[in-house]
Amino acid sequence: MSESEQYSRNTLMDFIEYRPLDIEICDVTLRDGEQTPGVVFTKEQKLAVASELDSMGIEVIEAGFPVVSAYEKEIVKEIANQGYDSRICCLSRAVKGDVDAALDCDVDIVSIFIAMSDMHLKYKYHRTLEDMLGCAKEAIEYATDHGLNVRFAAEDASRTPIDRLKQAFKEVENEYKVQYVSLADTIGILNPTTTHYLVSEIFKCVNTSICIHCHDDLGMATANTLAAAEAGAKQLHTTVNGIGERAGNASLEEMLVALRVQYGIERYDTTKLTALSRMISEYSNITPSVNKAVVGQNAFTHESGIHVAAILEEPRTYELFLPEMVGGKRNLVVGKHTGTKALKGIINSIGFCLEREELCALIEKVKVCTDEKRRSISREQLEKLIAQVRQEQKPSASEKEKFSI
């Protein structure tokens, strides 16, 4: 099967008008992902993850927040000096000391953030918009004067008046040479429609590349990020397995596969996604849900007889994309919904061949067993049932004697 046949293309996209995507990925697993409560990565782990992201073709890696600790700063600096093709970014408050830490780390990009929503100005900063914007401008000027590329990030942008965002972004764009302006849906309040509107409005008034950073509090982070891309966002933020604050972020694996299947963007090495997911699961001690898109245990697991019978002939009947495309494996399960044709295909695939009478007897045993255990049957259990059927189907001694007369 050729590369182009590894997935089914969404042909409905041919009828939809949208701006051609001009995107790059900024993976923030090592920074926002590590802000998942209880998650702490070691230096060796961060280096391993960064290496994988680089090898996949991820354009930007957000390596950390240097002022968090001396150890964090050491890690960010080491990642920045690995010679990756990926550009390395770090987070910074609108504070000179934070920018100095970024400079010490040799990063390519510093993300200087402030919030401009009434909620954050009143309850977090206890300062005016003018004060905070002034701090941001000072930090941006200091960073650009020292040769850093700057991303000016608006935290809680989704609850900030659009006119306020436009004004702030235009001022910064006109006064300083920033590479990006960034919109953060900090509490995951957006949906695809409002995301598209927000990004479209900002796109109209700035010449600088737009970044989108979505959280998954309503389960729409990936969809919102794609909507932002259609509206003109350049840099899309992701984390592996969608880990991050609270409900997490847009997931890297969903994003890369969606970009490939929906928009034909195939430059990322998606075959590494499953292994990378397992790596992050091990390092974070957080296992993705079994039905997690792309990398969940059940992403390519099938039990229903109708489904399995079709998959045995053509996997794409019930799979949007083949598991090989993301480095995964298909798993055909015997359970309550398994049919005779599917069962025959499954037992043949593991080296068994039964006569029709034996197969009919086996399917009955499978139904009884799954009803009793209330779960699918493991391969070991299936082999035991096959042995039982063969034993029961053997002719008795009297029958053998009758046949020999």
Curated annotation (Swiss-Prot):
Q: Which keywords describe this protein according to UniProt? A: Transferase
Q: Does the keyword section mention Zinc?
A: no
Pyruvate carboxyltransferase domain location is 23-274
Enzyme class at the top of the EC tree = transferase
Annotated InterPro entries:
AIPM/Hcit_synth_CS, Aldolase_TIM, LeuA/HCS_post-cat, PYR_CT
Q: Which domain of life is it from?
A: Archaea
- UniProt xrefs under Pfam families: HCS_D2, HMGL-like
MF term (GO), any: homocitrate synthase activity
**UniProt similarity note:** Belongs to the alpha-IPM synthase/homocitrate synthase family.
The name under which this protein is listed is: Homocitrate synthase AksA
Organism of origin: Methanosarcina acetivorans (strain ATCC 35395 / DSM 2834 / JCM 12185 / C2A)
